[in-house]
Regions:
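Bacterial N-terminal signal peptides that target proteins for export
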Residues: 1-11, 18-22
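Carbohydrate-interacting regions of secretory-pathway proteins
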Residues: 24-241, 353, 358-361, 366, ...
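Structural recognition of the beta-strand scaffold that forms the well-ordered cores
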Residues: 65, 104, 119-122, 245-250, ...
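Solvent-exposed loop/turn segments at secondary-structure junctions
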Residues: 71-72, 95-99, 110-111, 125-128, ...
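Extracellular ligand-binding/catalytic regions of CAZymes and related secreted enzymes
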Residues: 241-243, 250, 268, 421, ...
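Helical hinge/lid and interdomain linker segments adjacent to catalytic or ligand-binding clefts
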Residues: 248-249, 254-343
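A glycine-rich, often tryptophan-bearing local segment used as a flexible ligand/cofactor-contacting loop or short
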Residues: 310-389
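Catalytic beta-strand/loop cores that center a nucleophilic Ser/Cys/Thr
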Residues: 361-362, 366-453
Length: 521
């Protein structure tokens, strides 16, 4: 109790009140923000949410410590596992004894606790604290005291200096606690120590600049050293310019391999979008149904829910309906795919009508497998740009519950189900008298909704079989919808993409274990 109060007092003195010091997994914690929007990403008691060689990293008395007691042959890192960073502010306190360290951001995980990318440098010596260094890349990009613009081909333009390196070094406390702050907005990167701007970089070099990536701490190769971090606080920033951010929330594995491949599907969408509109749309994939990152939603422009639904839908657990409803009222776009369009009428139904204009309602909607026939696409809607009518066998739910009146819900994809799909026995998902009486009726399988708050909603009932993403028309329809839902203009010919057989299968969930025969037990 004394320790917790001590840490809170320290934070209060910095006007950064936070309190996530419980020994729990981050997924079970509600983010605690101060009035400036900072969120703690270190619980003060464990390495939960971080990955590194535990031989070198530990937690003591609320402090994250990296230490080597003998010469280290290769530089190693402690990597934040709960998300990636794009536009953000990071603030923390650090103390370093001997050697060199740094904060990696928007970086690449090379495996084996190795990292490449931007680094906010720190050291026990007099030369490098505050500089921008690119690990396993361009080396020193901006020295302390410099304002630089990095042009194509590595050409460097030096602007008006901030101050001399020596004067700025005098602001840093050697062997004591210092406050480091990183501000990254688009290609504009700033490093502050103890409130003093140390370096400022505008990175315009095509192919080198990075818009998002991992966050990590460094233990440098060489002499024994010790670096300590505490009060690690992250704040997401809304993306600058015309850029948008899409979160792809993939549910847990639930079916045999090849079906309900939520993770593989989201990763495939991410690759296609990165290849086609990566300069304007930043994507982040979160697995297991919901982000572990307590800051994930803070700068999102749109969200895809691709998961199992019904009573197990991730969005109806805990207080998440209220959380997403607040985002929707802010104008965040929401898209739902396949089973993700189903929620209980009494818990989520009203919200889905408000968010995306419709949902799968049990004892009203049905879930047969069938091949599209007599397909029609909406005319003059951006989601249908470059898409031609297609035939795909899938679990196409139909007879959705839509807003009333539904004039503001656009029918994106419609088809006429075989009469045989209306002849199944009645059940929660299988059939009902209304469906049975509508033989030959055209049904809505994908729809779009423009909300009064300015946000956009989209729903599609297909997506059961992962192999169907090999169909260029179906895949383009979904990619177009994700771009549109994010608030970005869809190209006239749609989002072009190519998916190889390898890309289609490389991220599949492993086959589930065989079911035990109860009679044999």
């Amino acid at each position: 109790m004394f320790f917790r109060q001590h840490v809170l007092n320290l934070l209060a003195s910095l006007f950064l009140l936070t309190g996530t010091l419980q020994p729990l997994e981050a997924a079970t914690l509600e983010p605690i923000q101060n009035k400036d929007g900072y969120v703690s990403i270190f619980d003060g008691q464990s390495l939960n949410g971080w990955k590194g060689n535990k031989k070198f990293w530990r937690v003591e008395d609320g402090i994250l410590i990296g230490e080597t007691t003998s010469p280290l042959k290769a530089t190693t890192y402690l990597i934040w596992q709960q998300g990636k960073v794009d536009d953000f502010e990071l603030q923390l306190e650090y103390r370093i004894t001997n050697g060199n360290s740094g904060i990696q951001y928007r970086s690449q995980d090379l495996g084996g606790f190795r990292v490449a990318g931007y680094q906010a440098d720190m050291e026990s010596g007099p030369n490098h604290s505050g500089i921008l260094y690119e690990q396993n890349g361009r080396g020193i990009v901006t020295k302390r005291g410099e304002r630089t613009s990095i042009e194509n081909y590595g050409m460097k333009k030096i602007g008006e200096p901030i101050d001399t390196g020596g004067n700025l070094q005098s602001k840093i406390l050697t062997g004591d606690w210092n406050t480091y702050r990183i501000v990254a907005r688009g290609n504009h990167l700033q490093h502050f120590i103890n409130g003093e701007l140390m370096s400022e970089t505008t990175d315009k070099e095509s192919g080198k600049q990075k818009a998002s990536g991992i966050l990590a701490f460094q233990l440098h190769a060489g002499q024994p050293m010790k670096v300590e971090f505490k009060n690690i606080l992250l704040k997401r920033l809304r993306l600058t310019g015309n850029r948008k951010k899409l979160l792809l929330l993939a549910g847990r594995a639930s079916h045999k391999q090849g079906a309900h491949e939520f993770r593989a599907g989201c990763l495939l969408f991410q690759k296609c979008l990165q290849d086609s509109v990566g300069g304007t749309l930043i994507t982040a994939v979160h697995t297991d149904g919901w982000p572990n990152d307590p800051t994930a939603f803070d700068n999102a422009d749109a969200i895809l829910l691709f998961s199992d639904g019904g009573n197990g839908h991730p969005v109806i657990q805990r207080n998440r309906l209220a959380q997403i409803d607040a985002l929707a009222k802010r104008g965040v776009g929401i898209a739902c795919l396949h089973y993700g369009v189903e929620v209980p009428k009494e818990k989520g139904g009203a919200e889905f009508l408000n968010w995306i204009g419709g949902f799968f309602e049990t004892n009203w909607s049905v879930n047969p497998h069938w091949t599209l026939a007599a397909t029609e696409l909406a005319k003059n809607h951006p989601i249908c740009n470059g898409v031609k009518p297609f035939e795909v066998n899938d679990e196409w739910y139909y007879h959705m519950r839509f807003r009333e009146p539904n004039d503001d819900v656009t029918k994106i994809l419609t088809a006429i189900p075989p009469d045989s799909t209306r002849e199944r026995p009645d059940g929660l998902h299988s059939n009902n008298p209304t469906v049975r009486s509508n033989k030959g009726h055209r049904e809505v399988l994908a729809w779009a909704y423009e909300r009064p708050d300015g946000g956009r909603g989209f729903g599609c009932t297909g997506g059961h079989f992962h192999n169907n993403w090999a169909n260029d028309e179906f895949r383009t329809l979904i990619l177009n919808a994700l771009v549109w839902t994010s608030g970005i203009a869809v190209p006239k010919n749609g989002i072009t993409s190519h998916v190889s057989d390898v890309e289609l299968t490389e991220d599949l969930d492993p086959p589930p274990p065989p079911r035990k025969n109860k009679k044999a037990l």
